[in-house]
Amino acid sequence: MGLDITQKKRRIALGCEGSANKLGIGVILHEGDTSTVLSNVRHTFVSPAGTGFLPKDTAQHHRAFFVRVAKQALSDAGIRIADIDCICYTRGPGMGGPLASVAVAARTLALLWGKELVGVNHCVGHIEMGRTITGADHPVVLYVSGGNTQVIAYAEQRYRIFGETLDIAVGNCLDRFARALNISNDPAPGYNIEVLARKGGRVLLDLPYAVKGMDCSFSGILTRAEELAAQMKANEGKGTDGEPFTGADLCFSLQETVFAMLVEITERAMAHVGSNQVLIVGGVGCNERLQEMMGLMAADRGGSVYATDERFCIDNGIMIAHAGLLAYETGFRTPIEESTCTQRFRTDEVLVKWRK
């Protein structure tokens, strides 16, 4: 995996991610202009069907499993503590409780082992890992997850946000709709919606489509989808053909509509910046139907779509280690007294010194 590393030296970082319900710890090696994933361990907090994950419960999960996951990551990597150059952690954005739990743990390791700390922007971690794994050079980035929906492109050492959700994230829309149908959260509600959607498609239900330039909105479509779910449960829901629709039809219709919105705003950004590449990152980026729809659009423009598998698109520690080590190699450090976390941390706040 090729990287643009200014200082050609062997360096190792341990990354800690815990901004939502995934606790991830990974170890990465940068050597010359290449990088190697040494370990990538993850443990997920799964809440009961019909519910979401609360910050306090998720934070408790991260505290309970941090030591176990860290030991496994070090064991898988086959390294000594002395080999590690820095400890990287997710500074934000994310849920306050889980972020704080992992920040405290990372700070403890840094003090215990005498290592320097690097606070990392969660989205920048996704982007840099995606670029490295796929080889995408100068893509428009679609960042889609449970907490974020942004269309991004790089310019002048910043990841510039060209469009975003005006209310809730697309992943949050899907997760909350899953509760309306009591869909399991194991392994993830979005994945289970994707599986159900493949069984639907007899009818495409009419749902709100809200795009404003390169911005979009998902709260209205969620409300309408929840209303249709309630009608279906009461045996009152009928499609355009007058026949009752199923939960699979609802999942299909929701996916098709929200993904069409994402494709539209991404294509608009591609035209604006003159790019023929799309890189999809974030948990929702694992969805094969989203990748397929984006691929059709990109092909019409003579372009390409890049995406990673679940090891890297779902929240993980290795992306934090990677982005943190890139920053570390430019001289960036996070002093212990400033090693806080924040629920709001814009992608374009980060100075991307490692890129030209």
From Swiss-Prot:
BP GO annotations: positive regulation of transcription by RNA polymerase II; telomere maintenance via recombination; tRNA threonylcarbamoyladenosine modification
Keyword Lipid metabolism: no
Record-level GO cellular component terms: chromatin; cytoplasm; EKC/KEOPS complex; nucleus
Gene3D superfamilies, alphabetized: 3.30.420.40
Top-level EC class: transferase
UniProt subunit comment: Component of the EKC/KEOPS complex composed of at least BUD32, CGI121, GON7, KAE1 and PCC1; the whole complex dimerizes.
Name recorded for this polypeptide: tRNA N6-adenosine threonylcarbamoyltransferase
Native species: Chaetomium globosum (strain ATCC 6205 / CBS 148.51 / DSM 1962 / NBRC 6347 / NRRL 1970)
